[in-house]
């Protein structure tokens, strides 16, 4: 058994372990990683990795609470282009709606709020995968819409 393995191996095996959907505690994950040869792994490292990769506790097919990585979430990383998280941009006479990948709406809304009024955005409300954008001026909603579309390289 190897005593040290590199970070890429750790990440790959960590994700594979979570896909099994059978580990209900962080200590069980630590034990499984140690069995794979990662002797320097501990609970705090596992906790940080669970956070980093967006792992959640959910019920598996046997109704047991286990850690898993939601497949559809597509957890944004520092290297993820934000434009890939925006799925649709639409509007009516008063509001702009942006649909995102699940879990990405608050990240995108925060970005939109940061550019704010100079770009025609009065404010945003974000759920899990939908953002409502209130334009600064209804008369200029078309300009605000174009600003948002260009920000995310969105083309219909």
From Swiss-Prot:
What does the entry give for GO biological process? L-arginine biosynthetic process; protein complex oligomerization; regulation of arginine biosynthetic process; regulation of arginine metabolic process
State where it is primarily located: cytoplasm
Q: Provide the protein's localization.
A: Cytoplasm
Q: In which pathway does it act?
A: Amino-acid biosynthesis; L-arginine biosynthesis [regulation]
This chain's function reads: Regulates arginine biosynthesis genes.
Name the family.
Answer: Belongs to the ArgR family.
Q: What is this protein called?
A: Arginine repressor
């Amino acid at each position: 058994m190897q005593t040290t393995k590199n970070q890429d191996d750790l990440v790959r095996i960590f994700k594979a372990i979570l896909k099994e959907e059978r580990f209900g505690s962080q200590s069980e994950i630590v034990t499984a990683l140690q069995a794979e040869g990662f002797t320097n792994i501990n609970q705090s490292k596992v906790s940080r990795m669970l956070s980093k990769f967006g792992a959640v506790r959910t019920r598996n097919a046997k109704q047991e609470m286990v850690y898993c990585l939601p497949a559809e979430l597509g957890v944004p990383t520092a290297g993820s282009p934000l434009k890939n998280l925006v799925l649709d941009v639409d509007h009516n006479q008063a509001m702009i709606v942006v649909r995102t990948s699940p879990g990405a709406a608050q990240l995108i809304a925060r970005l939109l709020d940061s550019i704010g009024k100079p770009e025609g955005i009065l404010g945003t409300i974000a759920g899990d995968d939908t953002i409502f954008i209130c334009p600064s001026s209804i008369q200029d909603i078309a300009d605000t819409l174009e600003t948002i579309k260009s920000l995310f390289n969105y083309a219909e």
